[in-house]
Amino acid sequence: WTVIEFGGPTCVPCKKMQPILAELQQQFGDRALVRNFYVTEHPKEARAHKVMAMPTQVVFDPSGKEVARHIGFWEKGDFLAALAKAGLK
């Protein structure tokens, strides 16, 4: 599993997501890779994943298929529910 947040260093909601992303990485350990990409540093990846606003979180299953997407601040409980619905528990 891979969770990527596309954001930016001056984006306030992106900054608010950082502790949640860190908690998710700790909670899922080796079952999921949680990463933060700044769109200014990774514009090609942001375009490839059709990122239109920051932050955008994209979740991929182990086969690389996109299984969830959210734009904006994502409350931890809602984030966990979406991950569980996608199959990551």
Located regions from the model:
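Short active-site neighborhood of thiol/selenol oxidoreductases, capturing the structured segment around
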Residues: W1-P9
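Solvent-exposed loop/turn segments at secondary-structure junctions
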Residues: G8-V12, T40-K44, K65, F73-K76
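Typically the conserved alpha-helix immediately C-terminal to a functionally engaged Cys/Sec
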Residues: K15-F28
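Non-catalytic, surface beta->alpha helical segment in thiol-disulfide oxidoreductase systems
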Residues: D61-K89
